[in-house]
Amino acid sequence: DCSSGWTAYGKHCYKVFDEPKTWEDAEKFCSEQANGGHLVSFRSSKEADFVVTLTAQTKESEIVWMGLSKIWNQCDWGWTNGAKLNYEAWAEAESYCVWFSSTNKEWKSRPCSLFGHFVCKSPAW
């Protein structure tokens, strides 16, 4: 079973939120909405199809965050000559997070600090 306003699929509940947030704020929001809640993750193409259909009902061709990211400081950087990176002068560290369009299930990345709509997923009870 799912809480009111959430939609069941398999053993999980899903809800689309129209209020744009940064990726980090959206993930925090999802964790506050339901026990075990997170930004949506996909375990199969069928699940992705279900979520795209769910988002298309409320949003048209919008950016929708999912729970996948590449945190900038977790990247392994290295020089092409194999030397260790012991000097850095980055202008600004930027993390990239993954989104999909409400019209298809193709994944794209963009800076996590930008705003997007989002889908929360939590275990059904």
From Swiss-Prot:
Chief place of localization: secreted
Tissue expr: Expressed by the venom gland.
SMART domains: CLECT (SM00034)
Keywords assigned by UniProt, alphabetized: Blood coagulation cascade inhibiting toxin, Calcium, Disulfide bond, Hemostasis impairing toxin, Metal-binding, Secreted, Toxin
Pfam family, one: Lectin_C
Keyword Calcium attached: yes
Cleaved signal peptide residues: none
Gene Ontology, cellular component aspect: extracellular region
GO MF annotation list: metal ion binding; toxin activity
Location in or out of the cell: Secreted
Alphabetical list of SUPFAM superfamilies matching this protein: C-type lectin-like (SSF56436)
Every C-type lectin domain range: 1-122
Disulfide bonds: 2-13, 30-120, 97-112
Positions annotated to bind Ca(2+): 41, 47
Subunit record text: Heterodimer of subunits A and B; disulfide-linked.
Family to which this protein belongs: Belongs to the snaclec family.
Biological role: Anticoagulant protein which binds to coagulation factor IX (F9) and coagulation factor X (F10) in the presence of calcium. It may bind the gamma-carboxyglutamic acid-domain regions of factors with a 1 to 1 stoichiometry. The dissociation constant (K(d)) are 6.6 nM for factor IX (F9) and 125 nM for factor X (F10). Does not bind carbohydrates.
Protein name, UniProt field: Snaclec coagulation factor IX/factor X-binding protein subunit B
Native source organism of the sequence: Echis carinatus
